[in-house]
Swiss-Prot record:
It comes from the Bacteria. Its EC number is 3.4.21.88. The gene is lexA. One of its GO terms (molecular function) is serine-type endopeptidase activity. This is LexA repressor. It is an enzyme of class 3 (hydrolase). It catalyses: Hydrolysis of Ala-|-Gly bond in repressor LexA. Residues 28-48 bind DNA. It holds the Pfam family Peptidase_S24. The active site is at residues 133, 170.
Length: 215
């Protein structure tokens, strides 16, 4: 059994909670802020120590490139055939026309070859984020959100959903009589959707994030 120091265990537990809650790991800056480190460099030192002990894997050049290893009960651990471990080819979805499938050919601007270690689970596509409604969850305008197609999501997960003619990224919160789509920015209002609404459709859950300049 791998023995971690108390501080390393705190970092490891924080990473695991972040993945379970939002679908992707925290940045070095977020780890430092949460655990009271003096700087992101201190978080980086603990991450490298965890990587040396074989409990996480780090992807070079990506602030969220952290993957948990060796967890038999971890639903977020990425498992792929050996031939797929080198890279994933993911379509990048730009603007989505009303009434047409997200992965319709006209929405795909290009494909990216991605390291699987960037993601908490195998994604199906990348969605270019527009706006700052999820800013406080670390999701910014222009980011590429990795999305796994799902018909259902757990309470608290960050989701991609259709709402009328729009596609939106929000945190899902179940409420009596429906669901609330939570914005992670006080400048934006939350959206309540009644159960059975024909205007609402879940498209998938967030499983990772790529920021231009870090890719």
């Amino acid at each position: 059994m791998i023995k971690l120091t108390a501080r390393q265990q705190q970092v490891f537990d924080l990473i695991r909670r972040a993945i379970e809650r939002s679908g992707f790991p925290p940045t070095r800056a977020e780890i430092a802020a949460e655990l009271g480190f003096s700087s992101p460099n201190a978080a980086e030192e603990h991450l490298r120590a965890l990587a040396r002990k074989g409990v996480i894997e780090l992807a070079a050049g990506a602030s969220r490139g952290i993957r948990l290893l060796g967890l038999d009960d971890a639903p977020h651990q990425l498992t792929l055939p050996h031939a797929a471990l080198m890279q994933l080819s993911l379509p990048l979805v730009g603007r989505v026309a009303a009434g047409s499938p997200i992965l319709a050919q006209e929405h795909i601007s290009q494909h990216y070859a991605c390291d699987p270690a960037l993601f908490s689970s195998k994604p199906d596509y990348l969605l270019k984020v527009r706006g700052l409604s999820m800013r406080d969850a670390g999701i910014l305008d222009g980011d590429l959100l990795a999305v796994q197609k799902r018909a259902e999501a757990k309470d608290g997960q960050i989701i991609v959903a259709r709402l009328g003619d729009d596609v939106t990224v929000k945190r899902l919160k179940r409420r009596p009589g429906g669901v609330e789509l939570i914005a992670e920015n006080p400048d934006y209002e939350n959206i309540f959707v009644k159960a059975g609404s024909a205007e609402f459709a879940l498209e998938g859950i967030a499983v990772g994030l790529i920021r231009p300049g870090e890719f």
